Amino acid sequence: MRAARAAPLLQLLLLLGPWLEAAGVAESPLPAVVLAILARNAEHSLPHYLGALERLDYPRARMALWCATDHNVDNTTEMLQEWLAAVGDDYAAVVWRPEGEPRFYPDEEGPKHWTKERHQFLMELKQEALTFARNWGADYILFADTDNILTNNQTLRLLMGQGLPVVAPMLDSQTYYSNFWCGITPQGYYRRTAEYFPTKNRQRRGCFRVPMVHSTFLASLRAEGADQLAFYPPHPNYTWPFDDIIVFAYACQAAGVSVHVCNEHRYGYMNVPVKSHQGLEDERVNFIHLILEALVDGPRMQASAHVTRPSKRPSKIGFDEVFVISLARRPDRRERMLASLWEMEISGRVVDAVDGWMLNSSAIRNLGVDLLPGYQDPYSGRTLTKGEVGCFLSHYSIWEEVVARGLARVLVFEDDVRFESNFRGRLERLMEDVEAEKLSWDLIYLGRKQVNPEKETAVEGLPGLVVAGYSYWTLAYALRLAGARKLLASQPLRRMLPVDEFLPIMFDQHPNEQYKAHFWPRDLVAFSAQPLLAAPTHYAGDAEWLSDTETSSPWDDDSGRLISWSGSQKTLRSPRLDLTGSSGHSLQPQPRDEL
């Protein structure tokens, strides 16, 4: 069901407001809005949350802040105080409602446990915010959870422009989770529908009527029936679960107020809630992953400059070096990769990739490079490309440095890595387990495309590891000194093929016996993380996909002609992967709406 459009006058004001202000015309009478901020143990997300609120393209003189915080065991209160001291005077009104004690609810098992008392207190707070907005004379109130980051600075204008009584901007997450339901049972529980995934994945776009929105939504206080909306106490006839989001959904239904979700635009991100037995560290790790997803998919999150953030302490996480192979002419990839490592507190060192575009056939031969006799791409049948030569030489230079410096073990990343959830923690645990089991290894894939996963065997005593089979990609791997020596000793430049075909030859898992016959010994000891810890940022067919190895010239062609080798299936998304949207995600959804 499509929504009615906003009143023409309001649409015009929302559209012309920024231009009128820039031209020095008196500020247009835009609707007054209350931003309701309810924070508990939100130190990990507050800087980005507040930064997003600061960047909303809406006159602060037409906005009021209603801010409450309670039951904190972190620095949430101090952060909010610091932020309000810096920006509060810019807003039309500020309500500050902190509670320092108690720090816990009596019956809670942990800070993420939702007890009945906690639900009631939250409903009372939201009702206070709603009452303040009405008394202040606001036209709208925006509720936005503190781990919901509105990266689209036009969010308020876009939502108001729909002219709807209750409307939510659809937010993206690390999983299938979002801030709306498409179905609800007569008892007030979540009901699965055929419409949810097409809406969540934006296969259908627009504003759609739904039974519930939560976490972030805009409510009009001038709409018909809006005066009957309430969080607490629940409606006299209320028998549904005692939960603030369900109570409000019932209130909307009882008042005849329609609820919509809009997904025509990318509005921002929301963190997937952790389970009740998990803690703040789990939530922090999840939010870091959300930041990384935003770095890939955009728009990026930007932290407020008005709050003091916990300092980062990057390290090499037990490796002697962390290499990042990156083309100098792809600065966006390089910057994103370094920003991702910084968020995970991993200290990486950029290695300028050998650029295949800059190579000609004579330069390639002067480097001692020659093609492996008979090599053809396994799918397209093409020969080696200059991009693949550059990629191989880039990895080769790292292997040389490992041997020259005697580095015991290193990490190697290409610059198109999408990190899975808790990458650092999972990698650290994996390496600790490998050390504890005294496993002898040369190379461990962290990201790859498995060709025959059903033929791979688990490593006894190491549930997160399998013996690597034939694989594509070299986007992320760990390498030991002994492994680097074996790779160099095989003298691969004299019989080159793509590096992701060379590695399986060296651990004797390549299916082509003719290729393997050129290399001996094939004794590289290779394993792989399972589940994988990294994936490509994009795949062939994605709008943002770009490959400097697949879109390239044949290795001995100096005509400057670029060919996109669409016949290769290496860069396609694996049909075995359970994916959502444009990327694979490692978190399993644990939303509060699965009641």
Swiss-Prot record:
Q: Which GO terms describe its molecular function?
A: identical protein binding
Q: Which residues are glycosylated?
A: 75, 153, 237, 360
| GO CC list | endoplasmic reticulum lumen; plasma membrane
Keyword Glycoprotein applies = yes
Indicate the secretion signal residues: 1-22
Residue ranges, compositional bias (Polar residues): 580-589
Query: Segment Disordered: which positions?
Result: 548-595
The record ties this protein, via SUPFAM superfamilies, to:
Nucleotide-diphospho-sugar transferases
Keywords from the named record: Cell adhesion, Endoplasmic reticulum, Glycoprotein, Signal
Motif extent (Prevents secretion from ER) = 592-595
Task: Enumerate the transmembrane spans.
Answer: none
One matching Pfam family is Glyco_transf_25
Q: Which GO terms describe its biological process?
A: cell adhesion; leukocyte cell-cell adhesion
**Record annotation: effect of changing residue 452 to Q:** Exhibits some galactosyltransferase activity
Query: What does the UniProt entry list as the effect of changing residue 450 to R?
Result: Exhibits some galactosyltransferase activity
Question: What is the disulfide pattern of this chain?
Answer: none
Family of the protein in this entry: Belongs to the glycosyltransferase 25 family.
| Name of protein | Inactive glycosyltransferase 25 family member 3
Q: Which organism is it from?
A: Homo sapiens (Human)
Which gene produces this protein? CERCAM
